[in-house]
Swiss-Prot record:
Keywords on record: Amino-acid biosynthesis, Arginine biosynthesis, ATP-binding, Cytoplasm, Ligase, Nucleotide-binding
Pathway: Amino-acid biosynthesis; L-arginine biosynthesis; L-arginine from L-ornithine and carbamoyl phosphate: step 2/3
GO cellular component, one term: cytoplasm
Positions of L-aspartate binding: T117, N121, D122
PROSITE patterns membership: ARGININOSUCCIN_SYN_1, ARGININOSUCCIN_SYN_2
Root EC class: ligase
The organism of origin for this protein: Streptococcus pneumoniae serotype 2 (strain D39 / NCTC 7466)
CDD domains per record: ASS
Binding site for L-citrulline: Y85, N121, R125, S173, E258, Y270
Binding-site list for ATP: A9, Y10, S11, G12, G13, L14, D15, T16, S17, G115
GO biological process: argininosuccinate metabolic process; L-arginine biosynthetic process; urea cycle
Catalytic activity: L-citrulline + L-aspartate + ATP = 2-(N(omega)-L-arginino)succinate + AMP + diphosphate + H(+)
Protein name as it appears in the record: Argininosuccinate synthase
Length: 398
C-alpha cells in the first residue's frame, strides 16, 4: 500500500534533512527547494534530498517571479519594518508557500511540511499563506514538534545516516535571497555584543571598502528599475549586480532589535546592499515626480503595508488593496538617479526625470524667475485666516 505524499519545503540544511528521515516513516516525501537567489549549490541540494530519503526532489528557479511579483512591491513601497528591516525573509515566504501549494495540487498531495521552529515568524508566514491559498491542505512542522536541542538533532541525524554539515559549529542562522541576507543566533543574541566581521557575508566592512567613491546610474520606468549604468537588465539580474557593486562599498549593513510577530524581541543582522541602494534612488525619483499630497500620504500606506507583509498577511485583502494603491502612484515615477557609493553610504547626488514636477524657472532666485511673488500676499492672507480667527476668538474670550 502506497503512502500519502507530503510536500516538504527543503533547504538542504540539517533541520529539513532530518525532517525527511522522520517524515518518511509515514509519508512519501517530495522535497521542494526554491531558488530565490540565495546562491546555494542547487544540484547538491537536489541530490541530497534523494540521498536522505525523499522519493522526489524538485529545485525550482523562482528568482524572476520573486523579483517582479514580491520584491518590486517592497521596493516601490519603501518597505522597512520598524523603519529598518527591508523584509528580506518575509517577502520570500508567500512565494514559497504559493509554489508548495501548486505542487501539492499537481501531484495530489494533501499535506505540506516546513522546517520552522516554534518561536520564529516564518512558521506563521508559511501556515497563514498556505491556508489562504487552500484551506484543505494540512500543514505539519516536524522541528516545532520535536522541540529537540541541537545536540539531540545531530545525534538523530548520525543514527539515521543523515549527512551532518561540516560547518555545523557555525553559530549563526542565515537566510538569504535576492533582496538581502539575514543573520541571527550565536554571539548576536546579546544585543550588547558588536557583530563581528565574520557575521557578514555579502558586504565589505566600510573601513575596508575602497577609498575612492563609485558613481552609478539607475533608471526607473513607472517605478521599476530597468537599467544600471545604461545596461538594460531584468529586475532579478539588476538586483544581483547591485548587491555585488554596493556590497563592495559596505552599503546596506543593518543591526536591528525587532519586535517579532510571536511576541519576543530578536536581534538581527541584515545585509541589503542592492535593496538599500535601490530604495534610496527610487525615493529621490519620487521626490521629483509625485504631487505633494501623494508624497505625504504614501509613507502612511508604506508603513502599514510593511507591517502587514512582516506579519504574515501577504494574501490578505488589506495587503492587496494597499499594493493596488502603491502601483497607482508609480505611473509617473520615471527618471534616472546618480548614486555615490562610498564607505557604507549610498547617496543620491543627482537626479532627472521626464515626468519631473520640479520647474527650475519657478524655483530659481535668479533673474530667470517666473514665480509670481505678488500672488503670495493674497495666499498668505487666506492660508493664515483660520489661525487669525482662532487667535481673535481666544483673545475675546479672556
Amino acid at each position: 500500500m502506497s503512502k500519502e505524499k507530503v510536500i516538504l519545503a527543503y533547504s538542504g540544511g540539517l533541520d529539513t534533512s532530518v525532517a525527511i528521515t522522520w517524515l518518511k516513516k509515514d509519508y512519501d516525501v517530495v522535497a521542494v527547494c526554491m531558488d530565490v537567489g540565495e546562491g546555494k549549490d542547487l544540484d547538491f541540494i537536489h541530490d541530497k534530498a534523494l540521498k536522505v530519503g525523499a522519493v522526489e526532489s524538485y529545485v525550482i528557479d523562482v528568482k524572476d517571479e520573486f523579483a517582479t511579483d514580491y520584491v518590486l512591491v517592497a521596493h516601490q513601497s519603501h518597505a522597512y519594518y520598524e523603519q529598518k528591516y527591508p523584509l528580506v525573509s518575509a517577502l520570500s515566504r508567500p512565494l514559497i508557500s504559493k509554489k508548495l501549494v501548486e505542487i501539492a495540487h499537481q501531484i495530489g498531495a494533501t499535506t505540506i511540511a516546513h522546517g520552522c521552529t516554534g518561536k520564529g515568524n516564518d512558521q506563521v508566514r508559511f501556515e497563514v499563506s498556505i491556508a489562504a491559498l487552500d484551506l484543505n491542505l494540512k500543514v505539519i512542522a516536524p522541528v516545532r514538534e520535536w522541540k529537540w536541542s541541537r545536540e539531540e538533532e545531530i545525534y538523530y541525524a548520525k543514527e539515521n545516516g543523515v549527512p551532518v554539515p561540516a560547518d555545523l559549529d557555525n553559530p549563526y542562522s542565515v537566510d538569504q535571497n535576492l533582496w538581502g541576507r539575514a543573520n541571527e543566533c550565536g554571539i548576536l543574541e546579546n544585543p550588547w555584543n558588536q557583530a563581528p566581521e565574520e557575521a557578514f557575508g555579502i558586504t565589505t566592512s566600510p573601513e575596508q571598502a575602497p577609498d575612492m567613491p563609485e558613481y552609478i546610474e539607475i533608471e526607473f520606468s513607472e517605478g521599476v528599475p530597468v537599467s544600471l549604468n545604461g545596461e538594460v537588465l531584468k529586475l532579478a539580474d539588476l538586483i544581483q549586480k547591485l548587491n555585488e557593486i554596493a556590497g563592495k562599498h559596505g552599503v546596506g549593513r543593518i543591526d536591528h532589535v525587532e519586535n517579532r510577530l510571536v511576541g519576543i524581541k530578536s536581534r538581527e543582522i541584515y545585509e541589503c546592499p542592492g535593496a538599500v541602494t535601490l530604495l534610496t534612488a527610487h525615493k529621490e525619483i519620487e521626490d521629483l515626480t509625485l504631487v505633494r499630497e501623494v508624497a505625504h500620504f504614501k509613507p502612511i500606506i508604506e508603513n502599514e503595508l510593511s507591517n502587514l507583509i512582516y506579519n504574515a498577511l501577504w494574501f490578505s485583502s488589506a495587503t492587496q488593496a494597499l499594493i493596488a494603491y502603491i502601483k497607482e502612484t508609480q505611473k509617473v515615477v520615471n527618471g534616472t538617479a546618480k548614486v555615490k557609493l562610498y564607505k557604507g553610504s549610498a547617496q543620491v547626488v543627482a537626479r532627472k526625470s521626464p515626468s519631473s514636477l520640479y520647474d527650475e524657472n519657478l524655483a530659481t532666485y535668479t533673474s530667470a524667475d517666473t514665480f509670481d511673488q505678488d500672488a503670495a500676499v493674497g495666499f498668505i492672507k487666506l492660508w493664515g485666516l483660520p489661525t487669525k480667527v482662532h487667535s481673535e476668538v481666544q483673545k475675546s474670550a479672556k
